[in-house]
């Protein structure tokens, strides 16, 4: 059991739009203060775009109670100041919602995270969110600049699943690895500077069902919003704890969309 007096809770992102309780989740996580370390996911960024008037609210995301709550401004301004990347040097542990592209070393990943975090926490955040949607560019270069650079960074941290062997992102395939078209590989199957030196925890990829990753790579999305389980990893002894979803496997397709 999580005890905020002695434990630190790491959350892999997508705090919202994964069930009916987005408002309650944000209020609870915010109340935990320094006892929680989280990263933003793609659904969190989409919520911020809705909040900024850039994207429309989809009824299937069930965000209306949150958007109409009296403390919505406080919660969402808090949310947009949360990080894309968590690093614990003592544990040699890195966490990002979708993972870490093999094209980056840790210093690059940290700088890239800071670039997007700085924009999100500024008054100009709507300009970034307006340009966030899109799949290109899909290959990292230090020469990338402006909104194209920020779009690649947010895609890599929050949407990535597959890469080409050269590390180029594929933003289309979502199936389990055994069904993926050649030559695509899961990002974690391509050796990179970060995965060679750190453990990596990530969410986002429900069809993995927590399986098939190399040693030191922890896939924690086990499809709770699709009728699977909510999975927690206790770091000290690497023991997993699961909570069955209270939703049926035969979900109405209109209720939630993984992306």
Curated annotation (Swiss-Prot):
Disulfide bonds: none annotated. It holds the Pfam family Metallophos. It is an enzyme of class 3 (hydrolase). It catalyses: P(1),P(4)-bis(5'-adenosyl) tetraphosphate + H2O = 2 ADP + 2 H(+). InterPro entries: ApaH, Calcineurin-like_PHP_ApaH, Metallo-depent_PP-like. Keywords: Hydrolase. GO terms for molecular function: bis(5'-nucleosyl)-tetraphosphatase (symmetrical) activity. Its EC number is 3.6.1.41. Hydrolyzes diadenosine 5',5'''-P1,P4-tetraphosphate to yield ADP. Belongs to the Ap4A hydrolase family. This is Bis(5'-nucleosyl)-tetraphosphatase, symmetrical. It comes from Klebsiella aerogenes. The gene is apaH.
């Amino acid at each position: 059991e999580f005890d905020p007096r002695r434990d630190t809770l790491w959350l892999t992102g997508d705090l919202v739009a994964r069930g009916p309780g987005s408002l309650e989740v944000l209020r609870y996580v915010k109340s935990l203060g320094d006892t929680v370390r989280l990263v933003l996911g793609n659904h969190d960024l989409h919520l911020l775009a809705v909040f900024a008037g850039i994207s429309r609210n989809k009824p299937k995301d069930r965000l209306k109670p949150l958007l109409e709550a009296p403390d919505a401004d406080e919660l969402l301004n808090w949310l947009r100041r949360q990080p894309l990347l968590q690093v614990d040097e003592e544990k040699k542990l890195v966490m990002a919602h979708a993972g870490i592209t093999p094209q980056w070393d840790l210093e690059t990943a940290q700088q890239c995270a800071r670039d997007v975090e700085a924009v999100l926490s500024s008054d100009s955040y709507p300009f970034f969110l307006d340009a966030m949607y899109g799949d290109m560019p899909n290959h990292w270069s230090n020469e990338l600049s402006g909104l194209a650079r920020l779009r690649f960074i947010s895609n890599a941290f929050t949407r990535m699943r597959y890469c080409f062997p050269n590390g180029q992102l594929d933003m289309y395939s979502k199936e389990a690895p055994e069904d993926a078209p050649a030559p695509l590989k899961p990002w974690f199957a391509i050796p990179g500077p970060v995965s060679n030196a750190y453990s990596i925890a990530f969410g986002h990829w429900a069809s993995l069902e927590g399986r098939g990753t190399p040693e030191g790579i922890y896939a924690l999305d086990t499809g709770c919003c699709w009728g699977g389980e909510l999975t927690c990893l206790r770091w000290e002894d690497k023991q997993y704890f699961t909570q069955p979803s209270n939703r049926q496997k035969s979900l109405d397709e209109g209720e939630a969309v993984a992306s």
